[in-house]
């Protein structure tokens, strides 16, 4: 039985202009290598957005695109500004380096919510019946 689909040997190749047009429409990204050895890709439309990696905050600014041309050594991009250092993460109110979260110690006695309640022994049987019906 013959296959109803056309053979791949008879298909025509996509013209190079069409391939280029398709490639231009895809999301363009740049690879950025970090000092720790990791790398990430940033889309051209996502510059000036930052993230934290291994305790260091990184920002993908326009100046960072010059990394792939060897930074300040590139003859194409010469500017006399000093490179900004990455911003290290400052201690914050919820920043804790310990993976264990301490819980408040349990105490014996009245809590603030129940301090105004009378002693449970002073409830009458009708009070207890009402509480059970709730």
From Swiss-Prot:
Belongs to the geminiviridae transcriptional activator protein family. Changing residue 52 to M: Produces local necrotic ringspots and systemic necrosis in N.benthamiana plants. Multifunctional protein that modulates host antiviral defenses and promotes host attractiveness to insect vectors. Acts as a suppressor of RNA-mediated gene silencing, also known as post-transcriptional gene silencing (PTGS), a mechanism of plant viral defense that limits the accumulation of viral RNAs. TrAP suppresses the host RNA silencing by inhibiting adenosine kinase 2 (ADK2), a kinase involved in a general methylation pathway. Also suppresses the host basal defense by interacting with and inhibiting SNF1 kinase, a key regulator of cell metabolism implicated in innate antiviral defense. GO terms for cellular component: host cell cytoplasm; host cell nucleus; viral capsid. It holds the Pfam family Gemini_AL2. GO terms for molecular function: DNA binding; structural molecule activity; zinc ion binding. This is Transcriptional activator protein. Changing residue 38 to N: Loss of suppression of PTGS. Produces chlorosis and mosaic symptoms. Its main location: host cell. Changing residue 46 to I: Loss of suppression of PTGS. Produces chlorosis and mosaic symptoms. Residues 73-103 are annotated as: Disordered. Keywords: Activator, DNA-binding, Host cytoplasm, Host nucleus, Host-virus interaction, Inhibition of host innate immune response by virus, Metal-binding, Phosphoprotein, Suppressor of RNA silencing, Viral immunoevasion, Zinc, Zinc-finger. GO terms for biological process: symbiont-mediated suppression of host innate immune response. The lineage of its organism: Viruses, Monodnaviria, Shotokuvirae, Cressdnaviricota, Repensiviricetes.
